[in-house]
């Protein structure tokens, strides 16, 4: 005899009050990930995924749009307060933080977590334009 089909349960959205926004700003792209305190991702967005291609991905405006998209998606979880971790030397660092502030989040702290080598790998050669 066949088993009765299990009813698909509705996935319950958990509510999170405090979160962390990780902004990875490289020279070519900007990635914004919003997580809870344990590091579980709630939402994310990138400049490339926001419709920008090529050299337009690495602009401050593209980082702003990506941060707005990630911020709006994380509002569904009831997020209010954010700590911001900024990593990398890219042009979208400040504009992404400003966009998250404009989404209505209360930003408690902004931390620069850019990894700095203790004379590790050899850097790329200088550009000759």
UniProtKB/Swiss-Prot annotation:
Belongs to the universal ribosomal protein uS11 family. InterPro entries: Ribosomal_uS11 (IPR001971), Ribosomal_uS11_bac-type (IPR019981), Ribosomal_uS11_CS (IPR018102), Ribosomal_uS11_sf (IPR036967). The keyword Ribosomal protein applies. Keywords: Ribonucleoprotein, Ribosomal protein, RNA-binding, rRNA-binding. GO terms for biological process: translation. Part of the 30S ribosomal subunit. Interacts with proteins S7 and S18. Binds to IF-3. HAMAP family: Ribosomal_uS11. This is Small ribosomal subunit protein uS11. It comes from the Bacteria. One of its GO terms (molecular function) is rRNA binding. Located on the platform of the 30S subunit, it bridges several disparate RNA helices of the 16S rRNA. Forms part of the Shine-Dalgarno cleft in the 70S ribosome. One of its GO terms (cellular component) is ribosome.
């Amino acid at each position: 005899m066949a088993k009765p089909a299990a009813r698909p349960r509705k996935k319950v959205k958990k509510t999170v009050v405090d979160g962390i926004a990780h902004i990875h700003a490289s020279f070519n792209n900007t990635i914004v990930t919003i997580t809870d305190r344990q590091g579980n991702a709630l939402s994310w967005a990138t400049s490339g995924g926001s419709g920008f291609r090529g050299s337009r991905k690495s602009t401050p405006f593209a980082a702003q749009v990506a941060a707005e998209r990630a911020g709006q998606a994380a509002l569904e979880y009831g997020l209010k307060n954010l700590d911001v971790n900024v990593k990398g030397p890219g042009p979208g660092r400040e504009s992404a933080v400003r966009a998250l502030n404009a989404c209505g989040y209360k930003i408690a702290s902004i931390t620069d977590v850019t990894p700095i080598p203790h004379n590790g790998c050899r850097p790329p050669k200088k550009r000759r334009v």
